[in-house]
Amino acid sequence: MRPLTLPRASSRKFLLLSGLALAAGAFLLTGGGSSPAAAGPLTPDGVVCTYGSEGQASTTQTFTLTARDGHITTPDGNTVYMWGFADGKGTFQYPGPNLCVKQGDRVRVILKNTLAAKTSIVFPGQSGVTADGVAAAPVLDGGGAITSLTPTADANGGSVTYSFVADAPGTYAYTSGTDEAVQTQMGLFGALIVRPAQGAAFAYNAARTEFDPTTEFVQVLSDLDPAIHNAVEQGRTPNILAIHPRYWMINGRSFPDTIAPNNATWLPNQPYNALIHTVANPSKPAIVRYVNVTSVSHPMHPHGDHGRVIGRDGALLAGPNGEDLSHEDFAIEVGPGQTVDALYGWEDTGNWSDPSPAAHPTLPDQPAALDTLHLSGDTWWSGSRFLGQQDKTNFPPGITVYNQCGEYYQVSHSHALNEVTNYGAAMGGMLTLWRIDPINHFDCA
């Protein structure tokens, strides 16, 4: 396990690292949706679900999404003007709420628009979508050109209600269907999770897709070109053909903000974190639901493990007779507009939970291992190579150690390394951490 270190913390970094320490404990946070009854419990890490106003158990799920503008911050101190979907009367957020429903639910989405431009929502993968009770169809101008993929909510107060039956389980996106290249870039998107009839611990109606519901994660992949956003904020027409992303994000954040807990107070409009948190030798795997709303592919790669891809675009990977077509990947390719469901289980194949010398015999005639430990600043390393062990005598004075109980931290990132930057500065962007707790000690309990 390579020790992970960062430069000495600024005041914002101190808040971030303190937030990670909180995320390591068994804390619950509050907030999120405009209606407490409609929102799921907020945890320091993992998926945060928003449920319909009728409550999670109802077979009708009604959501109100309000298109608003606002600002987000980036780890390098930049502030960027955005659009986004708020939960009802809630504040602007980026990305929009994670809408969680059950297979067979009647889903109603009321879109209210406070922006100075028309907007809309499309639901890729959903069939029979209606808008204000009429089959949703593209909107044409007088010359027959498409101006929107679906009926819109007028600017400055317009509204439209979409409805459909969520008949197929899986992971989906919802995005603007109006001037979609610009409006999706501005932030009008979110994730939709349809849970199968077989139960919330399954990704699809197949036993092989079972996962641990306490280790469920959504990673919405987006990019951001400040020039486009500046043009919109200033009332100019953006040149979307000249787009040049400067930031790459997971759940609306770039590293190191990706590892701050859900609802971090210093990221008020970016509520969702991207830390993957599992336990070694799990009885059931974790699931990561990837949602790509960009126009390019992202090869997502966690160090130290492969992911088993079980579904793509809301469809179980199965043959015509139900054959299991899932497969393991070193880097999981998430194409433009695609969603991918992958299972992960970190197995202690090297027996790193046992620090006894007998468990790790020294090979004969090998070069001596020299102590080359040089650390500065803050670290999540335990000081020991063994899972579940800590040795803080390995650290010189002045090191702040955030490790809780000898857990491991692995890097998980886009393997398109230009995307692991914040405005060109390395070790940022579409990157997060994967925390592995000792066997049978999730959250160090």
What are these regions (language model features)?
Residues L4-S18:
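Bacterial N-terminal signal peptides that target proteins for export
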Residues L17-T30:
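Bacterial N-terminal signal peptides
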Residues F27-T152, G158-T161, E233-I287, G319-G322, ...:
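N-terminal, post-signal-peptide metal-ligating segments of extracellular/periplasmic oxidoreductases
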Residues L65, V109, I121, S176, ...:
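Divalent metal-coordination and catalytic microenvironments
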Residues L115-T119, Q126-T130, A137-F202, D324-A445:
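Extracellular/periplasmic metallocenter environments
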Residues Y204-G235:
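Compositionally biased low-complexity segments at domain edges in trafficked proteins
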Residues V296:
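Aromatic-residue-lined binding/catalytic grooves and analogous aromatic/hydrophobic interfacial grooves
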